[in-house]
Amino acid sequence: MLYYAAVFFVIALIAAVLGFGGIAAGAAGIAKILFFVFLVLALLSVLSGALRKK
């Protein structure tokens, strides 16, 4: 997870250098998709952990 944070930090820096042009919109779109993917994965992880403890 830390790897993805570092990747998006680098993408954000590149987008800032290029003046928040097309790369920023693309990175924001990817970030939105990955946010929901990781949200679902986190919920599945919490649910599976709760079910294993029972």
Curated annotation (Swiss-Prot):
Q: Identify one Pfam family in the record.
A: DUF1328
Coarse class of the primary localization is: membrane
Q: How does it sit in the membrane?
A: Multi-pass membrane protein
Keywords on this record?
Cell membrane, Membrane, Transmembrane, Transmembrane helix
Record localization: Cell membrane
Query: What sections of the protein cross the membrane?
Result: 5-25, 27-47
- Keyword set includes Lipid metabolism: no
Q: Is Endoplasmic reticulum one of the keywords UniProt gives this record?
A: no
Which GO CC annotations does the UniProt entry carry?
Answer: plasma membrane
* Family, similarity comment: Belongs to the UPF0391 family.
Family annotation (NCBIfam families)? PRK13682.1-1, PRK13682.1-3, PRK13682.1-4
Q: This protein is called what?
A: UPF0391 membrane protein BAV1230
